[in-house]
Structure formats: C-alpha cells, structure tokens
Regions:
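Conserved P-loop NTPase mechanochemical-coupling segment
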Residues: 9-18, 108, 112-160, 188-193
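Extended alpha-helical interface modules used as scaffolds for assembling large macromolecular complexes
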Residues: 242, 294-535, 560-567
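Substrate-engagement module of ASCE P-loop NTPases
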Residues: 121, 162-173, 200-220, 536-539
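P-loop NTPase motor core
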Residues: 10, 61-126
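Walker A/P-loop-proximal flanking segment of P-loop NTPase domains
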Residues: 1-80
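Sensor-1/coupling segment of RecA-like P-loop NTPase cores
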Residues: 187, 197-238
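Amphipathic alpha-helical segments of the small helical/lid subdomains adjacent to P-loop NTPase cores
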Residues: 234-238, 245-304, 341, 346
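Domain-level recognition of nuclease-like catalytic cores that cleave nucleotide substrates
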Residues: 539, 543-567
Length: 567
C-alpha cells in the first residue's frame, strides 16, 4: 500500500526507486513529449534540485538495450504500447552526470572528467572482444578504460573525442545509433570560473560536445540538463539542430518539479493533507512556462520529516544544499536603486526586468543586470507574467527563498554597520547614558542606509521581531555588556535587558511597531508604561542593579522614535 512506501530522499536513480519500493511521482510523460517534439540535441535548463538527474536516469532505463522493462509497469508511459514497442530498450545509451567534475586546477577537473567517461565506458566491457569491431576499434575501447598506477590513463588528446568514440563503438556493436544523456553539463564551467581556469574548460567542453553532438553520425539524439543556458557561441558553436527548453518555455513545463495535484496526492498518501497550505507557502511558487510547480527536493524532505513529527515546522531544505553566493554577490553589488527594488521583492512586490537567458559564466558578475538574469534562471526569482515590451515580472517564489534573501541581507547589514566602529562606540555610549536623541539619530541613519527586511509582509508581531533582532545585534556587539532577549521578568517578558559594564546600571528596552509615523510617539509611551506596569525592572533590582534606564522605541518602516526615562 502507498502508506508503506518509503520516500526517496536524495535518491536519483530511477531503477533503485522502482525496485526498492519508493514513492515515485510519475514523470514518464516526459518520454512521450521528448519523442513527439523531436530534437536532435535537447537542452533543459532548470534550477538545482528539480528532478533533472532522476528524469535523465528514467530516460536511460527506458531507452537502453537490456534495461528492465518492468520498471515502467503501471506508469503512464506503459499505456502507450505502440511507442514502447518502437523505442523501449532499443538503443545503446551513454549517461554521464557532470555534477562532480571540479577541481582547484584544470588538471584536477580534467582528470575528474576522464574518470567519469572511463567509468561509463567500463559498463560496456564487452566491446573489448566485440566481433562487430575491428582490432583497432577494440584497442581504442581499451584506451578509454586503461589504468596505469591506479589512475585512468585516458590521454588528454583523446579526452575531447572520447564521447564520440564511445558512441561510435556502441553503434557499431549494436547496429543502432546511440543516445547521449549529459546531466549538469554546466557544472564544470561554473567550477572552472570559480577557480580560474574557465577558458581551458570552455575549450575542452566545446571540443567534446562539438564532436559528440555536431558531427556525430552515430548519434540518435542527445539530452542535456543544467542550470544555465550557456551562450551558444561559447559552447555550442555550429549546433544548428539545437533545441533549448528553458524555464520560460511551456513545453515540458510540468516535467521538472511537482504540480499542485502531485503534491496533494503525495500528502494524501501519508495522511498529511492538512499540511498543504504550509507546503505551498514554503515550497511552491516557481513558474515554468505555463505551470506553477513546487521544488521536489523540499516537498520530499518536508513530508519525510512530517511522517515522524506531524507538528514539525517547514525548513529550508533547498537552501541547505545550494550555495547562496549569488544572492550575497547581488546584495554586495546593489546600488541604491537596486536596494530599493530588493526591498520591494522581499515585501512581496514584483519587479519588471528584461532577462538574458543566454550568458557565459564570465559575464555573470560583470553587471547587476546579468545577476538579475542569473537569479531568475537559478530559482532565486521566478516570474508571474510578461509586459508588452517583453520584461518579466519577477517575484521571490516562496517563503523558503525569501528567508535566503533576509538572511543574506542581515549578514550584509551587520558587516556594513560593524565596519564603522567609531559610530558604534558613540551609539553604545549614548545608549548607556540615556541620550535618546543620539540613539534615535543613529538608528534612523542605520535604517535609512539598510535594505529593509523590517517591513516585509506579515503580522505586526513579525515586523516587531525583525526590528528586535536588529537592535539585539547592535547591542550584543558591545563585548562587555550582557544582552538578554525576551527575558522573563516581573509579571511578563521584557523585550531586551542589558547589564552594562557598570555593576550598578541596567537598561530595559520595549519595542513597538507603529502603523504610521504619527503613531510612533504614542507607541513609545505605551512601551514605557508596559515596562512599569509589568515591573520588568525587578529582574535588574534582584541582581543588585539599582540604576535602571528605560527605553520605549517605536519603529515604522525605516524610521524610529526613541524615548528614554530613568526609573
């Protein structure tokens, strides 16, 4: 029964999922669409963790000669008997995932690629004695898998043609053209750019793909997946039969990621339908073509946790497996205009931008406009429509990704504020003395120069908490002060209590969020009255601190009002 099915957390092999009884969201319609919309070379670009590798594995097991046809029993593709009879198990298949092709040097990465191709070639050990091959061809195969001193010995000059050669040998053995599947094709380029050997890797990948995909008479068709559509002039020069299916294309728009119906069915299978709303808020919102989809990695992980703990809160699963360097770079490069746009995004608004879907890695950080494009293609932004002049209406897709931006903005903000030690020292001195005017001036200047996450969509309590975190961070930077947050004191919980380096002194802070600027004064008075009524000062008095300073601070957007009193 469905209830007994395990969830495939981190499993990307189609056969393992089907044979070991894991829950599988049926994406086999992808096969039918691929054959109906025929393309000699097909590139699918999607963000990471959207099921690209699993779909490629599925293609391998469907088309490959000798694969277990029963893996597809009961799945949608099995209903198309004519297609299955014509294509299933009829082709040799080369399947490579480039996700681990990396290294600090070009030589390291080059060997990882050679290792990958040699490992795939070893699956076809029968080629070494195939009577369909000449002795020279058998020798060429042995060259692909040769090992010397514990390392694959694939020569550098052979590496460029290795894919084409393997497809030729397989085709001659089987009397059938070869299908080539290349997963995460752009990872080697990304890693090369990060480590300073981009030109060398571009040359290698361009040569390899050119021979395997452009002038290869032994190719049936090829499918590539990746995050970025790398410029055709950079990698895919001369590929006239090249079809790109990006996140803006309505073809295959439901084949990567989970649809609403698929998520509802998954939750129902584990009696978790009451978690649909939170799952949607955190992990839905990606727009691929005409489809709205969820990140499958997030959904699978969330449901897996909920099975053992139904009260578990959503977590940022995708964030934890993907670097957020792009968002960090974007924030650091942002000018005042871009920071304003970023604030609007975090607040839930849409920003209109023209997007370049085709870039080279060395162009990514050359302009802020290019970064907008990369954030869109990698899933940190999505679109909810296109203007008449072709600009995309960009939004943050969901709560999980909003948390990425908020975290990176807060890190940037903290770094920026703490860089000005003189201003900070003045703020701390004014705060300890009860100089409300100086404290207010510092906070207003700080807020005006920030990227606001302090007024994003949410309840007043949530907004107040954002300002609370800001102030705690500023005060905690004073090493010889003890700063406590949400402290049980008197007849309630004080927002912030500070025990300064003067053993007789202490400070109590109560924060309020005001709906309007004019309401801030009353909010400050309300905060001070709450401190007195709830007797928060008892906490400090009990610790021998008799000189107590009270602060009522009200925030509204990027402004604040500060009132101080001595108890």
């Amino acid at each position: 029964m469905t209830e007994a099915l395990k969830l495939p957390v981190g499993i990307e092999d189609f056969a393992e999922i089907r044979q070991a009884g894991f829950y599988y969201v049926d994406k086999t319609k992808f096969i039918e669409q691929l054959l109906d919309g025929w393309g000699k070379v097909n590139l699918f670009t999607r963000p990471r963790r959207f099921g690209k590798t699993l779909n490629m594995s599925m293609l391998r097991y469907f088309f490959e000669i000798g694969a277990d046809a029963s893996l597809f029993d009961g799945l949608q593709i099995a209903k198309n008997k004519k297609l299955c009879e014509e294509y299933q198990g009829k082709y040799p298949v080369i399947f490579l995932s480039f996700k681990n092709v990396e290294g600090l040097t070009f030589a390291d990465a080059q060997y990882r690629l050679a290792e990958l191709i040699a490992g795939e070639a070893e699956r076809f050990a029968f080629l070494a004695q195939s009577d369909k091959l000449t002795e020279n061809e058998q020798s060429l195969y042995c060259g692909l898998t040769a090992v010397r001193e514990g390392r694959y010995a694939l020569a550098d000059e052979v590496l460029v043609s290795a894919l084409q050669l393997l497809s030729k040998l397989l085709s001659k053995h089987y009397g059938q053209k070869t299908i080539i599947l290349l997963d995460e094709y752009d990872v080697p380029l990304d890693k090369a750019f990060q480590n300073g050997y981009y030109k060398e890797m571009v040359s290698l990948i361009r040569g390899m793909l050119g021979q395997a995909l452009k002038t290869n008479e032994f190719l049936q068709f090829a499918v590539l997946t990746g995050c970025l559509r790398v410029s055709k002039e950079s990698i895919f020069t001369g590929l006239n039969n090249f079809k790109v299916l990006s996140i803006t294309d309505n073809r295959f728009d439901e084949q990567f990621g989970f649809t609403d119906a698929e998520v509802e069915q998954l939750l129902a299978a584990y009696n978790l339908t009451d978690h649909l709303e939170e799952t949607k808020a955190w992990y839905d919102g990606y727009r691929f073509g005409d489809a709205d989809v969820y990140c499958p990695w997030d959904v699978i992980n969330h449901v897996d946790v909920l099975r053992s703990n139904p009260s578990a809160k959503p977590q940022a699963y995708w964030i934890n497996t993907s670097g957020n360097a792009l968002v960090k770079l974007f924030i650091e490069m942002a000018d005042k205009s871009t920071r304003d746009e970023l604030e609007r995004l975090v607040a839930g608004e849409a920003i209109e931008k023209h997007i370049r879907l085709e870039l080279t890695y060395d162009e990514i950080d050359s302009s802020i406009d290019n970064l907008w494009s990369v954030l869109f293609t990698t899933g940190y932004l999505t679109q909810k429509g296109v203007t008449e002049d072709g600009a995309y209406k960009l939004v943050i897709p969901n709560q999980e990704i909003r948390e990425v931006y908020k975290l990176q903005i807060q890190e940037w903000f903290k770094k920026k504020v703490f860089a000005d030690t003189e201003q900070l020292q003045s703020f701390w001195q004014a705060f300890a003395m009860g100089d409300s005017g100086a404290v207010e001036l510092f906070l207003n200047r700080t807020l005006s120069n920030s990227i606001s996450v302090f007024d994003a969509k949410g309840r007043d309590e949530e907004r107040e908490n954002s300002y609370h975190m800001l102030l705690v961070g500023l005060l905690a930077g004073k090493a010889d002060w003890l700063v406590r947050s949400n402290v049980e004191a008197g007849e309630g919980f004080a927002d912030i209590i500070v025990e300064t380096d003067d053993l007789d002194d202490g400070v109590i802070v109560e924060l309020k969020y005001a709906q309007t600027m004019t309401a801030m004064e009353k909010s400050c008075a309300k905060a001070l009255a709450q401190i007195r009524t709830k007797r928060y000062a008892d906490y400090l008095h009990n610790n021998g601190r008799e000189k107590v300073l009270l602060y009522g601070i009200a925030f509204c957007k990027k402004r604040c009002r500060v009132v101080a009193e001595k108890l």
